[in-house]
Amino acid sequence: HSFPTRRSSDLFNIKNKIFKGIGILFVLILLGFFIWINKTYEPQKLAKEALVSNSKVEVTVNENISFTPKGRKVSKGLILYPGAKVEIESYAPLARKIAESGYEVVIVKMPLNLAILGTNKAQKVMDSYNNIEHWVIGGHSLGGVAASNFARDNKLIEGVVFLASYPMGDELKELGKKVISIWGSKDGVVNFKSLVESKQKLPDDTTYVEIEGGNHAQFGDYGKQKGDNDAIISQEKQLNITANSIIKFLKNIS
């Protein structure tokens, strides 16, 4: 019988250690990802209050959250994708303000709270409404990227709303869709260089709204976001400017 030489046995041990090391590293990366993904931004007081139906708006909380104007014919709808790791209830104040002006608004629940993992979720929303003749999609931060990817591939989407966001490619430029891009001047999260450069990727008639003193987190109501700057305007003011800009944009969709 031939016995393994010491050299081959050493080699086996080294390989074994390397594989074990890779295995441990993989587990640690996975663990880190799950810890990161489970630390979400949660809705605060204003958001929770906005989830209650009133005389103007019916709020329905299922997998998604829909805001339906009461007592009026609704023919335009806005689908909203959340920012990364932001729980969708956080966008209730904005959605409600828009719905009060007569538009259906649906905030879409995403896998692991990452819109990029559920880019096509808007399709199911659109399929579930018979009364909506005009659809617009929008998103906050990473949600805007996912929303623009969906809009790029869907002929029935007539407009795109970017909140502290921008598209990855220039596909929207020539598609004939309306676009509005809104951001806060004190945003500490968005990459301003990419935001400015994205103007080249958007249609020539895009509407741009810079909210003086607004930041990244005040498009929702989920507290302070890591890396963000303090806003120098109130949350209410930022929400009002955002909602009014979107309402004006929706009016012009036809």
PLM region descriptions:
Residues 94, 190-200:
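Short alpha-helix in the alpha/beta-hydrolase fold that links the catalytic acid
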Residues 175, 181-183, 187:
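Short beta-strand/loop motif that positions the catalytic acidic residue
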Residues 19-36:
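Hydrophobic membrane-insertion alpha-helices, especially the h-region
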Residues 1-8:
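Short, small-residue-biased leader/transition segments that mark boundaries at the very start
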Residues 75-83:
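Short beta-strand element of the alpha/beta-hydrolase
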Residues 138-147:
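Gly/Ala-rich beta-loop-alpha elbow adjacent to hydrolase catalytic centers
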Residues 95-115:
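Conserved alpha/beta-hydrolase
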